[in-house]
Amino acid sequence: MAQINEIIELIAALLIFLGSIIAVISAIGIVKFQDVFLRSHASTKSSTLSVLLTLVGVLIYFTNEQSFFSVRLLLSIVFINLTSPVGMHLVARAAYRTGAYMYRKDDAPSRSSILLSSKEYNSTEELKNRARIREERREKIYYDVQKQRQKEKQQEENIESLSEARRETKD
């Protein structure tokens, strides 16, 4: 019985340790990546997994050690895994809609550093210019779609008027 308890404690400790390692990797990704989209990806994917592993390890440990099953831990696991990706998706969508900086391969410096920041390589004017260009593209696409819809509507009206003219000639 003592060996089983030690094995379960070892599994719980291993899960907590893996969760910690993944959290450190997530922190490095947040610091290393240049824009809000890459940072949100790094933080959401790995931190969700790290919290999952850590809380499952804690749940296993306390269930084994004190014969206490915590519904709060189980609910927190479910809640974090449901809300974290959704919340970060909303943050990324808001950043995109406001014209946030988007990293491009040609923006990459010749050598990368773990302390790389977008502020070092991009001025405010550049970011505003990219946001303006993106907004112009969106407007152009919107107006092109509107023109296409107007053409389709005009064609439908022409077809209807031709069919009415044919009906009148038959009568």
From Swiss-Prot:
It comes from the Bacteria. Residues 144-156 have a biased composition (Basic and acidic residues). Belongs to the CPA3 antiporters (TC 2.A.63) subunit G family. The chain crosses the membrane at residues 11-31, 51-71, 72-92. NCBIfam families: CPA3_mnhG_phaG, PRK12586.1, PRK12674.1-2. The gene is mnhG2. This is Putative antiporter subunit mnhG2. Residues 144-171 are annotated as: Disordered. It is a multi-pass membrane protein. Keywords: Antiport, Cell membrane, Ion transport, Membrane, Transmembrane, Transmembrane helix, Transport. May form a heterooligomeric complex that consists of seven subunits: mnhA2, mnhB2, mnhC2, mnhD2, mnhE2, mnhF2 and mnhG2. It is found in: Cell membrane. GO terms for cellular component: plasma membrane. GO terms for molecular function: sodium:proton antiporter activity.
